[in-house]
Structure formats: C-alpha cells, structure tokens
Amino acid sequence: MAHEIEIDSEADLGRTTFEAEDLYKQRTPITKPPAPRLQSRRASMQETPWTIKDSFNVETKDVVQRCIHTLIPTVNFFDVVDDRPDLYGPFWITTTVIQALFFSNSITEYARYATGHGTSGYSIKKLISAASIIYGYTTIIAVLLWGILVWNKCNPKLLDCLCLYGYANIVWLPVSLATPPFGLLSTLASHIVKYVLTGIGLLISIVFLTRNLYPICQQAGSNLCKLLLFGIIVFHCLLALSLQLIFFS
C-alpha cells in the first residue's frame, strides 16, 4: 500500500539565516556594571580586625609631623593623628630618649673627669634606670589613665593614650642632648642651666598632655576632670624630677 507524503513548502522549518542584529548581539560580550570599589573597600576595612601590625603602619612624614606638633602644641594632637594613632613613633622616640639620657650622662661624667671633678667611665645601671623610668612611666601611666577613663564611661582608646604619652617623650630628647656642654661650667651655673632646661621640657610636655586630655577627661565630670589633670601634672613633675636627679644633676 503506497502512502503519499505531502510536504508543505510554505511551512517554517526553522531559520536558516542570521540577521545582522542577531549576529552583532552574539559577538558583543556581556559586560557587568563596575562594582563600587570604594564602598567595598571601606566595608572590608571595617570588617578586618585590628592587629598590632596596623599600629606600626605609618609613614615617616606622619611621625615627623606629630613630633613637631608635640614640641609646638598649638593644635589638638588627635586632629593631627586623624584617627590613625600609631606605636611606631612612640616606641622609637622612647628608645631614642633612653639612649640619649645614657649618652648625655656618660658625656657629662667624662667632662667632669677631664676637669678633675669626677671619675671616668659609664654605669650600665644608668641605662637600666633610664629604660625602667621611661618605658615604665609611658606604659603604666597611659594604661592607668585609660582604665580610669573607661571606668567613668569616657570610652577612650588605649592606643590613643599610649600614642599620646609616647610622643610626649620627644621633649626629653633635646633636653638630654643640650645638657652635656654645660657640664664644663661651674657647679652652680651648670645646675641652674640644667634645671632651666628640664623646666622648659616639663612645661612643654605638660601643656601638650593637658591640652589634649582635657576634652576627654571633661566627659567624666568637672570634679573628676580636675582631679585627673592634677594627677597627670603631678606624675609628670615626678618624672622630670627623677630625670633631673639621676641624669642631669
């Protein structure tokens, strides 16, 4: 039995040609809109936990600028820091001051020996004393102040306190380097000049500390603020007196 197959020549058997528009669409790659890099970067920075390495990530020009504003405390130090406190500057400043104190004392002792008023040589005990006083004072007082402020709900950052007290030590560097030449003067004149230099360093550092800590301490109340500032001044005077008697006398 024969079957007849009818083929519809007009039927749509599929498209056999490409239009120019379809070909262009196929060749054109699909591009995605650019991701907001700034927002994603900020989000990643906020999500990244703080590490001790971050506090040493500071440029030399920033450290120099902070040292200048410490010696010339005309602006708020935390405005200069701009929420980027560091430990790199405080560590090297404190270490350099310790070495400068030891060097200054050794040169002074040699000058006294050369003029027949003392014995030559240096004492390693002075180096240990310098390290204990400077490192101990900077760390203990900063942590103690931070703890008191946190207890009174002022919520300062520990890194800010350590950074502030660390940079405050820079004033003792020029003082320690300026004292040896005056060891050749008479005893009375030498003592007067050294006390004047120590007093200048003390005054500059007190102005620097109180100027920057006053707005923070004020959050704890007027009475406690006065007490804290008084304690800051007293402890800093004790530091200056210790340096004067041990290294500059």
UniProtKB/Swiss-Prot annotation:
One GO term of the biological process aspect: vesicle-mediated transport
Lineage top rank: taxon: Eukaryota
Membrane-protein topology: Multi-pass membrane protein
GO molecular function, one term: small GTPase binding
Keyword terms, alphabetized: Membrane, Transmembrane, Transmembrane helix
Chain ranges passing through the membrane: 87-107, 131-151, 164-184, 188-208, 228-248
Subcellular location: Membrane
Record's GO cellular component terms: endoplasmic reticulum; Golgi apparatus; membrane
Family label: Belongs to the YIP1 family.
PANTHER family in UniProt: PROTEIN YIPF
Quaternary organization: Interacts with the YIP1 family members yip1 and yip4, and several Rab GTPases. The C-terminal cysteines in the Rab GTPase ypt2 are essential for the interaction. Interacts with snx3.
Function (record text): Possible role in vesicle-mediated transport. May be involved in proper membrane localization of Rab GTPases.
Entry protein name: Protein YIP5
Organism of derivation: Schizosaccharomyces pombe (strain 972 / ATCC 24843) (Fission yeast)
